[in-house]
């Protein structure tokens, strides 16, 4: 597939994959959550710290939808949005060197990070829809998730190590966005702001297909569950070492995503949307192991590796399925919903929902939190299986009628 691409498309593909590597900078920060909670700001509760760290997930949807609207109106190009976002993320890393002593500094950094991420996460994904054919999109979607997880490994490992030196050390990893922005300057074509037909009208319908919202709902619920793993690892492993240990565990979690992403294309061609069901099942298995063997680092590594595979099953499948029902006119908005708005809201509300619910039911135990959410993931797998099967059977019934 890659051999059929011309040089321009290959350069663009690699640029998109490099952008994917700086798509999860929060993983560079999560290893320090326990240190921030117990040492830096001990007067703040764990839920409060987790929520502030998830502010980017609250800001991103609103800024992303605004950028998608501006892009669809031809007021801003995708190139400007992506490059501007990358530079802002890099600037956030530099700001952390100055603003790192007050609690409002933590809020400020989270807001700046959210603004930067809003510029490129979904917009970069829409470049895949606009510039590649269906076979190429299926392949690149899997590779993109592998690079997201690969970047997450680098972020979590280095962020955990830097976090042992200073609580804001993880923010230094955001500076990696700077060289990526420079590469994007040359790789992303200066395409017309809005492609037109010969009679001057916009290409395609302006209405979003209903499937976009269904896959967006899948992603929202998935991230609501998936984020419980990373946001609680630091606390769960606090008895086994410092933030570096949490960083290693997070890196192993991302390894699961990398490995699974490499095989996503083949798996997707065989089972289609059932990969979304599988994503919830691996979360169930991983969290169950975490809750059953809380004192075993070896089992913890296996558990997070298995759970990490979930992201490389859910996200690329939903993105690929959405790419088949969008038009050039709706690609920016559709990818904003599925790659930023829904996962961001899921990530933001994750701590608010599950940390608060499980704390009231079982106390601060992360063991019981993982156990509770594992059964939520299992229930989600059953529901999604029913939805996918129903849709598949309905399509079979519609074929003869057509």
Feature roles, as predicted:
Residues 62-103:
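Conserved MFS/SLC helix-loop-helix module at the cytosolic interface between two early adjacent transmembrane helices
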Residues 30, 211-258:
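Extracytoplasmic gate region of multi-pass secondary transporters
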Residues 323-363:
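A late C-terminal transmembrane helix in Major Facilitator Superfamily
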Residues 143-189:
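Helix-loop-helix hairpin linking two adjacent transmembrane segments in secondary transporters
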Residues 109-147:
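Cytoplasmic helix-loop-helix junction between adjacent transmembrane helices
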Residues 170-186, 369-387:
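Symmetry-related core transmembrane helices of the 12-TM Major Facilitator Superfamily/SLC fold
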């Amino acid at each position: 597939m890659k051999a059929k691409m011309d040089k321009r498309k290959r350069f663009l593909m690699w640029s998109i994959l490099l952008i994917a590597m700086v798509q999860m900078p929060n993983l560079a920060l999560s290893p320090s959550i326990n240190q921030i909670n117990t040492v830096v700001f001990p007067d703040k509760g764990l839920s409060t710290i987790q929520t502030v760290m998830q502010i980017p997930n609250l800001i991103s949807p609103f800024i992303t939808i605004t950028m998608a609207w501006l892009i669809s109106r031809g007021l801003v190009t995708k190139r400007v949005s992506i490059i501007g976002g990358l530079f802002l993320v890099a600037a956030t890393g530099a700001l952390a060197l100055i603003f790192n002593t007050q609690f409002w500094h933590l809020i400020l950094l989270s807001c700046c990070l959210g603004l930067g991420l809003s510029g490129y996460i979904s917009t970069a994904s829409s470049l895949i829809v606009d510039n590649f054919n269906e076979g190429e999109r299926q392949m690149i979607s899997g590779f993109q998730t592998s690079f997201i997880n690969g970047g997450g490994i680098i972020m979590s490992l280095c962020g955990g190590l830097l976090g042992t030196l200073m609580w804001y050390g993880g923010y230094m990893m955001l500076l990696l966005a700077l060289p990526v922005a420079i590469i994007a300057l040359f790789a992303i074509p200066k395409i017309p702001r809005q492609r037109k037909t010969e009679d001057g009208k916009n290409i395609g319908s302006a209405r979003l297909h209903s499937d976009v919202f269904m896959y967006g709902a899948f992603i929202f619920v998935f991230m609501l569950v998936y984020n419980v793993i990373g946001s609680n690892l630091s606390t769960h492993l606090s008895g086994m070492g410092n933030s570096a240990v949490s960083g290693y565990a997070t890196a192993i979690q991302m390894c699961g995503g990398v490995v699974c992403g490499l095989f996503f294309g083949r798996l997707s061609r065989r089972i289609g949307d059932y990969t979304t069901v599988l994503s919830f099942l691996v979360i169930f298995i991983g969290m169950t192991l975490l809750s059953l063997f809380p004192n075993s680092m070896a089992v913890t590594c296996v558990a997070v590796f298995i759970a990490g595979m979930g992201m490389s099953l859910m996200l690329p499948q939903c993105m690929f399925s959405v790419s088949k029902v969008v038009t050039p006119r709706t690609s920016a908005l559709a990818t904003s919903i599925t790659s930023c708005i829904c996962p961001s809201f899921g990530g933001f509300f994750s701590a608010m929902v599950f940390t608060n619910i499980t704390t009231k039911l079982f106390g601060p135990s992360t063991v019981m939190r993982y156990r509770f959410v594992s059964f939520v993931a299992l229930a989600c797998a059953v529901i999604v299986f029913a939805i996918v099967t129903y849709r598949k059977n309905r399509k079979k019934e519609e074929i003869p009628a057509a």
